[in-house]
Amino acid sequence: MSKVYDWFEERLEIQAIADDITSKYVPPHVNIFYCLGGITLTCFLVQVATGFAMTFYYRPTVTEAFSSVQYIMTEANFGWLIRSVHRWSASMMVLMMILHVFRVYLTGGFKKPRELTWVTGVVLAVLTASFGVTGYSLPWDQIGYWAVKIVTGVPDAIPVIGSPLVELLRGSASVGQSTLTRFYSLHTFVLPLLTAVFMLMHFPMIRKQGISGPL
């Protein structure tokens, strides 16, 4: 086993990487509230795992979406647990994200030289809210349907571009299959990809600049 480790160590310098990670200085003022960002990340990873598991059974059509969710909850092995964990961690992710934003703002973590870290964090907060909006519609029950209809109808109040924007969101003049397809694509592909990209920008900046000091 040591020979295998030595082989990788010679090529990747694993020990140097581990030393860099474990030797990072942590300021003495750091408390449990500085863990909110990490908890949000953990919730996101749980979302990815449980969401991926549900894609094996979920059918993104207006005629089968609700019945496929019922199948997950009543027939699929541990489906009820997987979907419940997905819902609980979604709520927890939104809550932790909100608390994390407040903590950073109240402790001045957005100030120079951490402006870009703050900007990427705000983008991640918007993406988190977008996960909630798109995921809420996927069961395609009465609550999901009317939530989508209301949310996609909001831009209609914007002069000139309002109506085209509504049609872009819905995929047609009214809420239907095109809308569900778009929301499913956003929820399972576009938003996770964008979130991963901005996380890969957010975390190295935190790593480079360190945790902000006390006020």
UniProtKB/Swiss-Prot annotation:
It is a multi-pass membrane protein. Heme 1 (or BH or b566) is high-potential and absorbs at about 566 nm, and heme 2 (or BL or b562) is low-potential and absorbs at about 562 nm. GO terms for biological process: photosynthesis; respiratory electron transport chain. PANTHER family: CYTOCHROME B. One of its GO terms (molecular function) is metal ion binding. HAMAP family: Cytb6_f_cytb6. Heme b 1 binds at H100, H202. InterPro entries: Cyt_b/b6_N, Cyt_B6_PetB, Cytb/b6-like_sf, Cytochrome_b_N_euk/bac, Di-haem_cyt_TM. This is Cytochrome b6. GO terms for cellular component: chloroplast thylakoid membrane. Its cofactor is heme b; heme c. It comes from the Eukaryota. It comes from Agrostis stolonifera. The lineage of its organism: Eukaryota, Viridiplantae, Streptophyta, Embryophyta, Tracheophyta. The gene is petB.
